[in-house]
UniProtKB/Swiss-Prot annotation:
UniProt name for this protein: Aegerolysin
Keyword Isomerase on entry: no
Assembly description: Monomer.
Function (record text): Has hemolytic activity against bovine erythrocytes at nanomolar concentrations. May play an important role in the initial phase of fungal fruiting.
GO biological process, one term: killing of cells of another organism
Organism in which the protein naturally occurs: Cyclocybe aegerita
Family to which this protein belongs: Belongs to the aegerolysin family.
Keyword set, alphabetical order: Cytolysis, Hemolysis
């Protein structure tokens, strides 16, 4: 569970 805010940053 790490691509839950990374997607928003990218």
């Amino acid at each position: 569970a790490y691509a839950q805010w990374v997607i928003i940053i990218i």
